[in-house]
Structure formats: C-alpha cells, structure tokens
C-alpha cells in the first residue's frame, strides 16, 4: 500500500497563490470579459452566433426557441451557466442596448424601464441580417478552429467579421485588474473612417474625426462637447457627457410650460429616472414642478414634466441635469484583446487591427478559393480531353470488367491531342485519378456539343478567376480594393442616419447658477475638519461677551483657520508642504454651528503627513495681482496670481519649503504694497513689497524677518493707507495700534516690538488690519466664537500689553482671529 504522505508535494503558498491567481486572471481576461479587437465579440457572444450558424438559424428562416440556442452553446461549446448565455442573447436582441442588433428576437426581451425578458422557453430568436456579415466565409478556411471543452466539437477562434463590430456595437466588461467600456458608433461613419485609413495609413486623428465624429448610441440623446471624444480616440481613454434630448412645450390654454424628454442617455433606466425625479420633487430639492408623466408608447419615448407658471424652465432643466441621470458621464476605456493580450487602443489602432484582420481573412479565403478553382480546372481539363477522345473513352468503358478496371486503363493510357496544345506537352496527356473518376461519373448528356462548349467556357472563366485570385494575393493594392468593395457593399446595405447629436463645446452645468450668493464663515480645525455656515448665524456682541459656539469639536481639536467668503468664491488651500489646492466655497460641507464639518482629507488629495495651514478666498482672478506668502521661519515669496489660475485636482507647488518650515500666511498684493510680518514673541517688521522680486511657483523665497530661537511668524499683513493693526493674544488680550506707529525697515531685519508679551496676556496668535466700522471674530480652542465691534477696542502704543477682548475659561486659549469688513456688517442684524 502506498504511503499518502509520499504523494504530497510541498509548495510555497505565496508562489502558488501568485500562480493560481494569475492563471485565473488571464482566464477571465481572455476567456470571458474582454472582446477581441478583430470581431468585437466576447467568447460567449461568438459561441452563440456560431451555434445559430450551425443550426441554420438565419435571418430569412424560421425563429427557433432561445432555449435551443442556450442548450447548444452549453452542451456543445462551453459549460456556461444558462442564465449567462441567455442574458447575452437578450442583450444582442435589445434595440436599446446594441446599435446594430445581432439577434432578431420574437417575444418579450425586456425594456428600457428595466423589465426582465421572458423566460428562454417562451422567446424565439434568429440571427439578424447584419450578423451574417460576421460569419460569412467561415466555411472557406478563413479562421482557425479550436476544440471545445471535451474535444468533441470545434469552434472558431475568431469570426471573419466583414463589419467593424467592436466600434459599431461597442463593448463593456469587467475583468481582473482591468475593464473595458467602448461606446457604439454609426456604421456609415466607421466604414468611411476605414476607407479613409486604407487610402492614407498616416491619416491624422483630426482628419479621422471628420469621418468618425463620435459615438452614436442606440438611445440617441446628445453628447455634450467634443473634447472627451478626441482624448478617447487619441489615448483610448476619455470621458464624455451624455445629456437627454429635450424640448420645451407651451400649453396654449393655460400658457404653462412643460419640459419634454424624447431621448435619454445610454443605459439609463427610464423607470428609475422618473422615480428619482419624483423623489427630488417630494424632498423639495427641485422646486417648480407640478406634474410628472411617462407618456411613452410604441411610437417612442416621451417624459413630460409640467412646471409652475412662474418657474424658469432653464433653471429646472439645469437642476434635473445636475441631480438626475438625465445627464451622465460615460467613461470610455477602449481595452480589447490584441494578439491574445489586453491592450488599450486608440481609434486608429482599432481600425488598423480590424483591417489587418480583413487582410488575413481575404488571404486565407483567396488561397482556399484558388485551391478550389485549381482543382476544378484540373477536372475540367480532364473532361475536355475526354470529350475530344470520347469514342475511345466509351470503347474502354464498354470493354472493361468494372469501373475500377476502366479507371485503371484510362489513367495508364497516353492520350494524344493536336487540338488542345495547352493541355498536353508534346501532344501527350495522362489523366489523374480524380480526372478519371470524373470521366466515369460523366452523364451521357454531357457529351453533346452544347455541354462541351459549357465546359470550355467554365474552364476559361476559372482561368480568369485564377489570375484575379493570384493578383489579390500578390498585389496589396488589389487586396485593399477588395476590402473597400466589401465595406462599400455593407455600407449600401446597412447604413443609417446618426442618432446621437454632438455639441461643439462641453456645456457644463454651472453649479453657481444653482447656489445662492451669500456671505459665509469658513472654518478649518486643527484636526482638519472644514465647513461653512451662513454669516447671518452670528449677531454682533459687546467686548467681553461669552460668544456662540462656532463648531462642535473633540476635546483634542480646535479651530485653526477662519475666513469670511462668498459661496461663489474660490478657496485657495495652502498646505504645510507648500502645495496649493483649489475648492469652491459651495463645494465645502454646509453645517450648523454645532456640527464638526467634514475632514478636508476627504475633499482634497492630501498625503498622510500633509495638512492645510492657510486658506485664502479669491473672488476674481486679476492679472495685476500677486500672491504674497510667508513661512513660520520668516521666508517670504511673491508670485503672480495668474500662475495659480488653472485648478488641478492633485494641486501644484506654491513654494519650496526648507526643512521643518511651513507656510503660515498668504495675501493678495498689487506689487506696490507694504508688508508686515508679526511673530508670536511680539516682534514686527514692515518693509516694501517691491524689495521682493516676483518668483516662479517652485522658488523657495527670500528672508523677510530675522527669527530668534523659539519664535515664529504668526501673521502676514498688507497694510492699507488708513486704519490700525489689531493684535490678539492666546489669553484673550488684544489692542489696536496705529499703522504709523510701526516704522518701515529693510527686509530681513529683526524688527520692532508690536505688543508687550507677559504671562498675563500670552503670546500673539494673530494680527489684522481694521478700521473703526469693522467687526472681528475670535475663536478659542474650545470652539467658542465671539464677535466684537472694533470701535470697542482701545488704541494703544506698541509697547503695551492690551486689554481683555474675550474672557476665556481655565485652560482655554484663543487660536484664531478674523475681520468682518463693513459691507458685510450692513447685511447682518446688529
């Protein structure tokens, strides 16, 4: 008896997992999820069409039960699940799924509302007329055949595919580690593109797009903008926006308007779409809609949305596009199997591979036909020679014992003829076995003069056919003429008009049109929680008040930055690494005073140790403005605002920082300002902005102030002609000092005293420029906010410690200071 332990093979589990998972991945990629670039089909679709081909389930013959096709595919070619095969059949029979249906279905095959197809035992199918163009010439040895799972049947590795199916019907699928999503196109346009590529292999993408302007979906609708199309055609990846086709109708009786949709984006479920619109109306997220009806019937789609008389149709339309699937993004990812390997393909590469496939098919077909023609010519030569010597042939047959004896004599005899010199060299001719058999099979009526002429005519025609086939094989130009001829024939038989319209430029839904303009308080906590809330939530209080809670935060967290902005403003977010990110204020979470907000790392692509240290609201980009930056180590830098005009999701470098330094302040300047830098230990330096040259984004900057040990810059101020500087400290103290009290010094000096620092008032947390009518906000690390009129804060000399601005609790410290300017004061309740 064998010892089982001796038959166990020890393997490294890590290597086994790698190997097994790789095998599984390639099996899914090659054998299931991705289409082949040559015929545009996945294996299951290829097996279905081949099964129908073998069954003669042709477009002009009777329908067959879907279950019969499913059974043949599973039993003969591959043991799929029956539902997987039937689902593939259903999709190929849905006019809203495929631009050019490959299966003609009879029965219930589902709907655009998401209704399921009837069971396979009820529905019937046959190949569509255009599907035959995928299978034509299959019997002419044009492709390789592979054995099925048990070796009892053979199935084509690929279909001959006269039509560029990958482009005209598209494909989608998810493999392991990759996916494909190729949109459908118009057959007429794709063939025009193929013809243009044949005429000029070096055709540019711009010229190619004149023939193939973009996808053409079975559900029509509108492609919003061309830029995504061009990117996808160039690189194989891109994103387009598909928008529902609409029209605004006016009721003649009540003068009310209705928005009517006749076409919706590709693969959108109409029933769920209508439910979503109704839900938005119920939740009052869309206002102005009075009625919603689905009036679709056999003649076409029609979704009617009635709106209030005073409502603006364009505004509601924008809201619908923004909040529902009446506008969707379609991510194009043109991945297909190319020579058995998954590859992302450009439009030109897809056309090139399809036409290369057609070349190979025509070569194999021509060789097959040439061999067949030569065999037939060989037989005709024998028949022709036999008819010339018919009397001798008949005599041999009469005198032979049997057909075998007659064949042997005919083959061995040397036949002479002076009439047909091209058949016999030196007037000698020997019949082959095949010729001899054909002579014996010859019917008597074939020896008439008329039949002899027919044989000679057929022989001559086949000689011409041989020359044509040889020319196709030897002359690439002739071969491409054949390809073009076949493509033109398909174009004449199957082309139709484009359904999907394409707009010239992408028309983004302007979210700002849907957002009310209002002044808000934007806060950023030390732990990175960001939010905004209406400025009107806060009423002005007298100096020394306890204030309102600005944010509910954890004990270890506190508010670090606060700015006043408009909901339509852009927030420039400067990180500790000197990277600049962009956000619109309305993209931030709107929260109540008691809410924490949302982690900014969920809104911006920050690295693990990166945090936002400064935020700056920008209302409008102006070419004559600069961004002036300062770091905690006293380094300053000036860059043109225009360098930061184009947002990038990943952010851009704003300043190159030295080790252990961070960006703490930013300001907008015009190039002729004064600059003031305040340190936490009570120092300030004021210098001319023009002493700092304008630098590129990646520059490191120059020294702005000399920093002593344990000191750092906390505030950057660009002072105006009038007003004073309000300084606040950690323990709630503060004061105002006239700007004129701060002397202008040279850049990179130590500066002068700005406030007298004591244990009582604490170190400086911030400094701002104010005027008499201003108000300020102060926030503590406990999240308490107090709003104070500047007029209530006394004006003191530089070398003083200030007065109490906010009474803090034990261990509570002031962490942020922000000004509210006069125009905002007029809008709030004092």
Curated annotation (Swiss-Prot):
| UniProt keyword annotations, A-Z | ATP-binding, Cytoplasm, DNA-binding, Isomerase, Nucleotide-binding, Topoisomerase
Record Gene3D superfamilies: 3.30.1360.40, DNA gyrase/topoisomerase IV, subunit A, C-terminal, Topoisomerase II, domain 5, Topoisomerase, domain 3
GO MF terms held by the record: ATP binding; DNA binding; DNA negative supercoiling activity
> Where does this polypeptide localize?
Cytoplasm
Catalytic reaction(s) noted? ATP-dependent breakage, passage and rejoining of double-stranded DNA
**Enzyme Commission number, as recorded:** 5.6.2.2
* Motif, GyrA-box: chain positions: 541-547
Q: Main location per UniProt?
A: cytoplasm
- One Pfam family, short name: DNA_topoisoIV
Q: Identify the InterPro entries for this entry.
A: GyrA, GyrA/parC_rep, Gyrase/topoIV_suA_C, Topo_IIA-like_dom_sf, Topo_IIA_A/C_ab, Topo_IIA_A_a_sf, Topo_IIA_dom_A, Type_II_DNA_Topoisomerases
- Return the GO cellular component terms, semicolon-separated: chromosome; cytoplasm; DNA topoisomerase type II (double strand cut, ATP-hydrolyzing) complex
Please name the SMART domains in this protein's record: TOP4c
| Catalytic residues (UniProt) | 122 (o-(5'-phospho-dna)-tyrosine intermediate)
Q: Which example biological process does GO assign this protein?
A: DNA-templated DNA replication
| Taxonomic superkingdom | Bacteria
Q: Which residues form the Topo IIA-type catalytic domain?
A: 34-514
| PROSITE patterns associated with the record | TOPO_IIA
Subunit structure, briefly? Heterotetramer, composed of two GyrA and two GyrB chains. In the heterotetramer, GyrA contains the active site tyrosine that forms a transient covalent intermediate with DNA, while GyrB binds cofactors and catalyzes ATP hydrolysis.
Q: Which family does it belong to?
A: Belongs to the type II topoisomerase GyrA/ParC subunit family.
A further note on this protein reads:
Few gyrases are as efficient as E.coli at forming negative supercoils. Not all organisms have 2 type II topoisomerases; in organisms with a single type II topoisomerase this enzyme also has to decatenate newly replicated chromosomes.
What does the UniProt function comment say about this protein? A type II topoisomerase that negatively supercoils closed circular double-stranded (ds) DNA in an ATP-dependent manner to modulate DNA topology and maintain chromosomes in an underwound state. Negative supercoiling favors strand separation, and DNA replication, transcription, recombination and repair, all of which involve strand separation. Also able to catalyze the interconversion of other topological isomers of dsDNA rings, including catenanes and knotted rings. Type II topoisomerases break and join 2 DNA strands simultaneously in an ATP-dependent manner.
**Entry's NCBIfam families?**
gyrA, PRK05560.1, PRK05561.1
By what name is this protein known?
DNA gyrase subunit A
**Organism in which the protein naturally occurs:** Buchnera aphidicola subsp. Acyrthosiphon pisum (strain APS) (Acyrthosiphon pisum symbiotic bacterium)
């Amino acid at each position: 008896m064998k010892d089982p332990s001796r038959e166990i093979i020890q393997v490294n589990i890590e290597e086994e997992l790698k190997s097994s998972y790789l095998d599984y991945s390639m099996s899914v990629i090659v054998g299931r999820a991705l289409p082949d670039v040559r015929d545009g089909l996945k294996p299951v679709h290829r097996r279905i069409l081949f099964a129908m081909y073998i069954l003669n389930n042709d477009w002009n013959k009777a329908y067959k039960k879907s279950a019969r096709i499913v059974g043949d595919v599973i039993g003969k070619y591959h043991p799929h699940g029956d539902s997987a095969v039937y689902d593939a059949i259903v999709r190929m029979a849905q006019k809203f799924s495929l631009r050019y249906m490959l299966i003609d279905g009879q029965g219930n095959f589902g709907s655009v509302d998401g209704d399921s197809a009837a069971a396979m035992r009820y529905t019937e199918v046959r190949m569509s007329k255009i599907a035959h163009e995928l299978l034509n010439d299959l019997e002419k040895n044009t492709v390789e055949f592979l054995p099925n799972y048990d070796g009892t049947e053979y199935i084509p590795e690929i279909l001959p595919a006269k039509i560029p199916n990958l482009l005209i019907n598209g494909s989608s699928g998810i493999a392991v580690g990759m996916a494909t999503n190729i949109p459908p196109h118009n057959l007429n346009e794709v063939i025009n593109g193929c013809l243009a590529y044949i005429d000029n292999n070096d055709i540019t993408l711009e010229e190619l797009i004149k023939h193939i302007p973009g996808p053409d979906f079975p559900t029509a609708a509108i492609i919003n903008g061309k830029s995504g199309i061009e990117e996808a055609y160039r690189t194989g990846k891109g994103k387009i926006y598909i928008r529902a086709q609409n029209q605004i109708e006016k009721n003649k009786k009540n003068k009310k308007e209705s928005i009517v949709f006749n076409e919706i984006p590709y693969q959108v479920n109409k029933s769920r779409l209508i439910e979503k619109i109704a839900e938005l109306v119920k939740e009052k997220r869309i206002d102005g809609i009075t009625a919603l009806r689905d009036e679709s019937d056999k003649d076409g789609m029609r979704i009617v949305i009635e709106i209030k008389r005073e409502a603006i149709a364009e505004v509601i339309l924008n809201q619908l596009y923004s909040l529902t699937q009446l506008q969707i993004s379609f991510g194009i990812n043109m991945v297909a199997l190319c020579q058995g390997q998954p590859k992302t393909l450009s439009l030109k590469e897809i056309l090139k591979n399809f036409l290369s496939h057609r070349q190979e098919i025509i070569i194999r077909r021509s060789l097959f036909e040439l061999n067949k023609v030569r065999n037939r010519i060989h037989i005709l030569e024998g028949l022709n020679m036999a008819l010339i010597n018919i009397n001798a042939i008949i005599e041999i047959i009469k005198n032979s014992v049997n057909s075998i004896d007659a064949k042997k004599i005919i083959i061995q005899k040397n036949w002479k003829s002076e009439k047909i010199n091209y058949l016999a060299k030196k007037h000698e001719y020997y019949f082959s076995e095949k010729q001899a058999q054909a002579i014996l099979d010859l019917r008597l009526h074939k020896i008439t003069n008329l039949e002899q002429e027919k044989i000679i005519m057929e022989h001559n025609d086949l000689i011409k056919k041989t020359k044509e086939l040889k020319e196709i094989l030897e002359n690439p130009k002739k071969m491409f003429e054949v390809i073009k001829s076949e493509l033109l024939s398909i174009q004449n038989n199957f082309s139709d008009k484009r359904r999907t319209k394409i707009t010239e430029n992408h028309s983004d839904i302007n979210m700002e049109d849907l957002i009310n303009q209002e002044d808000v308080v934007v806060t950023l906590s030390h732990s990175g929680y960001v939010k905004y809330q209406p400025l009107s939530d806060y009423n002005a209080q007298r100096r020394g008040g306890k204030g309102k809670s600005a944010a509910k935060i954890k004990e270890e967290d506190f508010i670090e930055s606060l700015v006043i902005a408009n909901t339509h403003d852009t927030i420039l977010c400067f990180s500790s690494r000197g990277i600049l990110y962009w956000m619109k204020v309305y993209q931030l979470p709107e929260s109540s005073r008691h809410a924490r907000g949302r982690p900014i790392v969920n809104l911006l692509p920050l690295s693990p140790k990166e945090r936002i240290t400064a935020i700056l609201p920008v209302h409008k980009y102006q070419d004559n403005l600069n961004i002036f930056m300062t770091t905690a180590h006293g380094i300053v830098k000036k860059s043109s605002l225009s360098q930061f005009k184009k947002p990038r999701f990943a952010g851009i470098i704003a300043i190159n920082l030295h080790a252990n330094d961070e960006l703490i302040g930013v300001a907008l300047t015009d190039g002729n300002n004064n600059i003031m830098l305040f340190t936490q230990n009570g120092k300030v330096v004021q210098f001319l902005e023009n002493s700092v040259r304008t630098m590129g984004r990646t520059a490191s900057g120059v020294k702005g102030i000399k920093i002593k040990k344990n000191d750092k810059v906390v505030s950057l101020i660009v002072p105006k002609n009038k007003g004073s500087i309000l300084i606040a400290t950690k323990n709630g103290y503060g004061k105002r000092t006239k700007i004129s009290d701060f002397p202008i010094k040279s850049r990179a000096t130590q500066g002068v005293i700005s406030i007298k620092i004591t244990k009582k008032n604490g170190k400086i947390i911030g400094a701002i420029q104010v005027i008499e009518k201003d108000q300020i906000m102060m926030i503590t690390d406990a999240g308490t906010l107090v709003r104070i009129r500047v007029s209530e804060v006394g004006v003191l000399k530089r070398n003083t410690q200030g007065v109490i601005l906010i009474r803090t609790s034990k261990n509570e410290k002031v962490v942020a200071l922000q000004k509210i300017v006069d125009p905002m004061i007029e809008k709030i309740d004092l």
